[in-house]
């Protein structure tokens, strides 16, 4: 019964939010429903919001990193011009056109290698186009990019900019 009630509630949240991630504006499945206050027992509509898997993973970064599905990138020197929601949108756009392995393949690669897999580069034009699309589609600016969550095996070095030094470290929070 709880499962049925959750399915109905989930659909109402997705419909209310126009099946669009409220952080970055991504509007393709799969989409998740996030408990804003972090309490999975608080199913008040005001505590629920539609999020894409990447934005959801960022909100639960401790669990995501512990599961071996990603890492934390910290910039050293000037701040990255990219924000988390822009990075998420770019990564999803890349997956959507088949530039990267699927998220589940990335997760499997992380578990098998125990760390970041080989980085794959995407041309600057594709990145800029995807970030521009994010802005046009209502991507919300959340926080300055002092740190970013990135799934393992992605092109974070390219996104952080050639002039910056960055490192990826596995962190447990």
Regions found by a protein language model. Name each.
Residues 1-8, 57-173:
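Extended charged
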Residues 2, 8, 12-14, 20-51, ...:
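Histidine-centered nuclease catalytic patch
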């Amino acid at each position: 019964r709880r499962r049925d009630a959750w399915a109905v509630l989930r659909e109402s949240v997705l419909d209310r939010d126009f099946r669009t991630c409220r952080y970055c504006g991504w509007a393709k499945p799969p989409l998740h429903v996030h408990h804003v206050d972090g309490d999975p027992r608080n199913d008040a509509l005001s505590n629920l919001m539609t999020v894409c898997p990447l934005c959801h993973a960022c909100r639960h970064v401790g669990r995501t990193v512990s599961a071996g599905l990603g890492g934390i990138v910290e910039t050293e020197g000037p701040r990255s011009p990219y924000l988390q929601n822009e990075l998420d949108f770019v990564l999803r756009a890349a997956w959507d056109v088949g530039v990267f392995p699927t998220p589940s393949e990335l997760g499997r690669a992380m578990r098998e290698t125990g760390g970041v897999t080989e980085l794959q580069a995407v041309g600057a034009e594709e990145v800029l186009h995807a970030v521009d699309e994010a802005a046009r589609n209502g991507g919300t600016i959340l926080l300055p990019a002092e740190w970013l969550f990135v799934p393992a095996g992605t092109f974070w070095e390219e996104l952080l900019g050639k002039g910056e030094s960055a490192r990826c470290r596995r962190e447990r929070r």
